[in-house]
Amino acid sequence: MVIGSGVFLTRTCYLRLQPPSLVLRRRFCAATTACSVPLNGNKKKKSEKEKVIVISGPTGAGKSRLAMELAKRLNGEIISADSVQVYKGLDVGSAKPSDSDRKVVPHHLIDILHPSQDYSVGQFYDDGRQATKDILNRGRVPIVTGGTGLYLRWFMYGKPDVPKPSPEVIAEAHDMLVGFQTEYNWDAAVELVVNAGDPKASSLPRNDWYRLRRSLEILKSTGSPPSSFRIPYDSFRVNLVAPDADDFLEDGSSADISIQNIETDLDYDFLCFFLSSPRVALYRSIDFRCEDMLSGPNGVLSEARWLLDLGLLPNSNPATRAIGYRQAMEYLLQCRRYEGESSPREFYAFLNKFQTASRNFAKRQMTWFRCEPMYHWLNASKPLDSILQCIYDAYESEAEMVEIPESLRMSKDVRDSREASELKGYRSKNRHFVRREDCSSVLEWIRSEGCKSEASCVESAIA
């Protein structure tokens, strides 16, 4: 996801973040940052800041259900931090809340764009922050929910103060790249931007035309590449690299999490929770979820067909890079080359790619959030009522520390040798698609419907 990702693999963690107590100690340390988040010059106390709940977790962990129940209990509204749920028509693959759920609890930043449009982390910051203010002004509780790590990081810490390009620069950058994009000549476009002054353009995800164009806009506006602008999160992270000596035991392990300047300088009192499960159980749940998304006539394949009928190609923009949609679009294109014919073997190969990509995405999400110091990890396999009560108590409390009951804590790492062994030998076990004939209805749909264009019908439905 983003899914096409927005979450990417972070290889270096700057601090061991798994203390024995899992107590978040709030301490003051003066520092300054170039940050678009309003900082509190008067250093407001915790009780004086408005509270915002953040719930994240890997795909399939149950964070949406948790947020829904929490919103009912706290008179809250949900802000989606999902890079795919912003798109109209992409319902099944993004696991959007149902219409009935959205009538019970107001949801924000869902169904706000057409799949052909780009949506950036900077746009999410602006939209998410505005939604937060509106919810608080109504006297309700903002609950930000999603697994797109970069969205949540910018939402909390702020976005880089990069000058906004003029309309002339935007038009110039567009004109310089549009020919390459029309001809699907990604490599030549990257070479142009690298030669213009941004060597890191070569490491962008393939066909991420939005970010490539944005890089060129910044170069044209400032003469510097995007990487030269300081990111607010990095300013906070610097404070974590050199913690006080008393934060470590004699063996070098962390005895506590020192969030020195973060909570003091952020403009809201963020209560952050990461919901996860033992890895093997999570992977099994993800595999079953992928199967569910392919069952029935209105699943991911139907939505992928619509994207193709709009003239979009897999991996060509944020919507078509999303996990599930990209694989389904590639599979349908393959079927269309053979006039709608597909063998069970080809279907199961597609299903395996979908499941593998989803599990790998969950793994990257956990790697990302393992290095995010603000989050309390909760075990999703525990009773929902217990988890709800834990978060509710944390919200209502005015204490300077948030403590997670031992029974609800989730380890950030695989520490059990048995679990490590099971992960090493993990194999998908389907519950719907097991035998060759189990996919016959899907293959029949592809033959009869999968190669027909229904873009106009869907267009009118989501208008």
Curated annotation (Swiss-Prot):
SUPFAM superfamilies: P-loop containing nucleoside triphosphate hydrolases. ATP binds at G57, P58, T59, G60, A61, G62, K63, S64. It comes from the Eukaryota. Induction: Not regulated by cytokinin, auxin or nitrate. Pfam families: IPPT. Substrate binds at T59, G60, A61, G62, K63, S64. NCBIfam families: miaA (TIGR00174). This is tRNA dimethylallyltransferase 9. The gene is IPT9.
